[in-house]
């Protein structure tokens, strides 16, 4: 940082801080890494086959098991082999019960991720509001890694306090009337604080707009935890058409259960599938080839960034939001509404990201339109209205590229050095090593080579 004092600054540039932080820079590194992947992305064309069949007045769309291929001629040859077969044979027809699991009890990291995704607030704003709600006695301590409730907690008493609310009171009452189920146990217990949950009821008229959003999310998450999993029936059909395999999937939601109080998860019935029998043969109503191209990944969003930081040990549940705010304050990163330059499309063919258009028509003729690129997420999840994505500034990119070339063996912009230092410190304490030795090992990692 000695160079900073040698560079003349004028006007608004005077007094700006350019600093290195062992958590701050990996945070910036995640943003820059995704940005470079987007900027350097080169789309590739691909081709795939889709088959359709109408039975009992229901149009069934079969997706190619291969997904897609990047060799057009290979797809054409395979497609012609399918056409020569003329008929398809059903080799699998299965209906089985399925569930969408209710959410785990709420941790700080999950509160920040979901707050950024659903509440139109930054993670720092979410934590500030949560702390205010805790201070006022409405929710439990909002800084916790615990995602399991102790068996001794009287959760029913907490549910009962929510029965008076106009929005979710009826659902809370249904839990009191026999619908209550013990929450799922996660893997984490910090032995200090329980999962985040409402401790008292407060009317929305007593809260400001942001407090309403956070309090409602905490309450609905808690009630969802105390409810039953959503129940459905999944139908899977697989056919053999000219030696190639195609499949169709259908879902019927039977009981929404926790979804009735937790609108942040989406799980809806898909296309209705008619009854087939194994061994049945039929002539496809339509068989088409489609082309598309891979598309660049999206820029990093705040929920994704928090997840990366959590997985790589960058910051704690109490400091992640601060690190994200700091790289914006230093003007290394700017935030903008997600999809500002167009959101990438999804491919119902399940073969990768990209956009596609159909070729051919019934039995291989021309006409028709295809699907969009990319496998759509199958695990539900709510909308993304209000989510922000991060774009590094020229300064942010320059800092990462500069620090990557200073001569240290382990990159300063990656999470590995910070993780190694943390592991070394923990190991030193746990094994009773000499503190000076642990310090020497840490300093050695930072030496220029």
How would you name each of these model-derived features?
Residues 1-449:
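Core catalytic DNA strand-manipulation module of type IA topoisomerases
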